[in-house]
């Protein structure tokens, strides 16, 4: 392994672009380890120093510069690894706008290609940087997508490394767009967030301070490069900080979750991040004897973000892995979004996480009433920490756009230099989301996050998405709470694979719950589970279920970061497209009736369009 990094001699705060930063690292820390890929999350594969990464980036950039494509958009289609980091940096070195996207999966083309195609259309991308294997996968379906045939497909493994000698500085500044981060689309069609070099450099500096990165920090990451959490904190912050990063594939993590923790132990990682489900999965997969095989006492910041944080999962993980050296204060719950580059808030390193306890009925009325932990009707919410550096947050009524009282839940509005320019070629959406002002004041502009939450004693709490909120009889219900209630009833109900949403029935909102059953479930009676689930929801949430579906695995869609796509699940339910194992409804013909209703609406829309 390379010697200890000498990153203290690099002034990151004096660099305007990622190009300047990496060029400086390549000069001052030429032989220091930058990235190592772990094959199957275990065996060391490709490693690069900063000098080698700079050489790869210059070669890729010089190849692109031959075609004079500065300002063009390039898709990055790669498996997780060092290659995609080099391609990302190569785009920046050429002044090409990078677009990290999930690579198509040969066994799931129908599910993965439509989103890729929509991104190509939206960004008007003309270049694809990829590998030979992915080129072969695409070749089988390329004739079905005319957009792909007009693009230049480049296998970066075949680019001559010596070409880097012909690289020319792209002459860009901090205002240049570095990449487009396509939002995960949990509640809407994905949009390309425009992130400048200035956004990225500034925010990496903020994360270095807020998350406690030091000269001896080490990162282990399996978060996908095409997700903002994986790209910014997983891959770019180590580059900014000048410290080593060990990269795992997300597939390796899902297949063998404990290799993530074993890698943290082996490489003495101080920083590693994951969504809530990863901590839950690790608890469910660990066996007592395995705890003896690793030491987690090195871990200083266990980032927890990208999906709702469940305090019970945090407590269970801490209880399970404390014998392996994990500490409660290692947890670092956080909140963020691509539109703010990444994090809005996080818990400072090695401070105690804060769990708030609130009256659940008051929260349903958007009121904040703190209560004791042991009372009845209590909802525990994990704080997402304190605001990052210069970040300012306002809690605002999403309808009136007035600032909420301190004891009210509202929409989270953000102001910070890390807030991005807006959405690629979407001026209306940009105006709506990025240029909000508080009614009756000159306060603004703010970024509207679409998330509900509140501030209490300097801690930011998240309550869910506005568009996911279930409102029945004037009372607010959070889908993640209902889903959690269901999934605790039986081990064969898949954790994190349920969706609660409402549908309109005769002018009234009604509750629908869809829950997947484990693939290897045996000796269960799904029909017998239905009344048990209905009763639990009635007791815990005082809600009557209108329709309940126990579905086969693969019916609950998730975003690239693991968020439940409740609107997609609702659409599948209404279209009668769910793979049903068992179901119940107040109206046995509900699916067919809603299909008919959708057909009527589509016919009416077509009629109105034709009569314009």
Question: Where do the model's predicted regions map?
Answer:
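AMP-binding/adenylate-forming catalytic domain of the ANL superfamily
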Residues: 15, 496-497, 503-504, 509, ...
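AMP-binding/adenylate-forming catalytic core of the ANL superfamily
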Residues: 262-265, 272, 416, 421-422, ...
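AMP-dependent adenylate-forming
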Residues: 21-48, 178-180, 187, 336, ...
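Conserved ATP-binding/catalytic segment of the ANL
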Residues: 381-407, 411-472, 598-600
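Conserved AMP-binding/adenylate-forming core of the ANL superfamily
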Residues: 34-86, 106-114, 166-171, 192-198
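Conserved pre-ATP/AMP-binding loop-to-beta segment of ANL
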Residues: 30-33, 153-154, 161-182, 188-189, ...
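Conserved AMP-binding/adenylation subdomain of ANL enzymes
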Residues: 201-218, 228-270, 285-290
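Gly/Ser/Thr-rich phosphate-binding loop
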Residues: 269-273, 285-377, 392, 400-402
């Amino acid at each position: 392994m390379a010697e200890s990094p000498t990153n203290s001699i690099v002034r990151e705060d004096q660099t305007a672009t990622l190009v300047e930063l990496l060029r400086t690292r390549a000069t001052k820390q030429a032989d220091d380890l930058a990235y190592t890929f772990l094959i199957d999350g275990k065996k060391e594969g490709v490693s690069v120093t900063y000098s080698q990464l700079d050489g790869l980036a210059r070669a890729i950039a010089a190849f692109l510069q031959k075609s004079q494509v500065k300002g063009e958009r390039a898709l990055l289609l790669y498996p997780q690894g060092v290659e995609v980091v080099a391609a990302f940096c190569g785009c920046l070195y050429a002044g090409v706008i990078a677009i990290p996207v999930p690579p198509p999966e040969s066994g799931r083309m129908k599910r993965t290609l439509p989103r890729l195609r929509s991104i190509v259309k939206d960004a008007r991308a003309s270049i694809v940087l990829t590998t030979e294997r992915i080129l072969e996968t695409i070749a089988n379906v390329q004739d079905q997508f005319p957009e792909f045939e007009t693009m230049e497909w480049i296998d970066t493994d075949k680019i001559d490394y010596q070409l880097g000698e012909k690289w020319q500085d792209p002459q860009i500044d901090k205002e240049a767009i570095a990449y487009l981060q396509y939002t995960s689309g949990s509640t809407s069609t994905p949009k390309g967030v425009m992130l400048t070099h200035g956004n990225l450099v500034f925010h990496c500096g903020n994360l270095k301070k807020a998350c406690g990165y030091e000269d001896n920090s080490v990162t282990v990451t399996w978060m996908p490069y095409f997700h903002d959490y994986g790209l910014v904190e997983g891959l770019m912050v180590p580059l900014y900080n000048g410290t080593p990063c060990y990269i795992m594939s997300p597939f390796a993590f899902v297949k063998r979750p404990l290799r993530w923790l074993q890698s943290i132990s082996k490489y003495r990682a101080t920083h590693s991040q994951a969504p809530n489900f990863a901590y839950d999965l690790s608890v469910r997969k660990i066996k007592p004897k395995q705890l003896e095989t690793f030491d987690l006492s090195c871990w200083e910041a266990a980032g927890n973000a990208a999906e709702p944080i469940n305090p019970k999962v945090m407590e269970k993980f801490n209880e399970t892995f404390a014998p392996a050296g994990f500490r409660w204060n290692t947890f670092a719950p956080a909140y963020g979004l691509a539109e703010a580059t990444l994090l809005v808030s996080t818990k400072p390193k090695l401070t105690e996480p804060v769990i708030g306890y609130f009256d659940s009925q008051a929260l349903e009325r958007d009121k904040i009433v703190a209560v004791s932990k042991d009372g009845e009707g209590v909802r525990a919410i994990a704080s997402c920490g304190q605001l990052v550096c210069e970040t300012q947050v306002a809690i605002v009524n999403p309808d009136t756009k007035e600032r909420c009282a301190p004891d009210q839940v509202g929409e989270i509005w953000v102001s910070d230099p890390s807030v991005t320019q807006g959405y690629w070629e979407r001026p209306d959406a940009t105006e709506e989301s990025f240029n909000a002002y508080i009614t009756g004041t000159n306060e603004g502009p703010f970024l509207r996050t679409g998330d509900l939450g509140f501030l209490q004693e300097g801690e930011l709490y998240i309550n869910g998405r506005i568009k996911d909120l279930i409102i029945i009889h004037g009372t607010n219900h959070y889908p993640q709470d209902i889903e959690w209630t269901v999934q605790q009833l039986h081990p064969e109900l898949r954790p994190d694979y349920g969706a609660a949403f409402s549908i309109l029935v005769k002018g009234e909102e009604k509750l629908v719950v869809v829950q997947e059953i484990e693939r290897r479930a045996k000796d269960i009676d799904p029909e017998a589970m239905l009344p048990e689930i209905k009763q639990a929801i009635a007791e815990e949430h005082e809600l009557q279920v209108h329709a309940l579906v126990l579905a086969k695995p693969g019916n609950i869609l998730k975003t690239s970061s693991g968020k439940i796509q409740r609107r997609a699940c609702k659409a599948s339910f209404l279209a009668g497209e769910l793979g049903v194992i068992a179901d119940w409804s107040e109206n046995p013909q509900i699916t067919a009736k809603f299909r008919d209703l959708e057909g009527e609406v589509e016919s009416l829309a077509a009629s109105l369009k034709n009569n314009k």
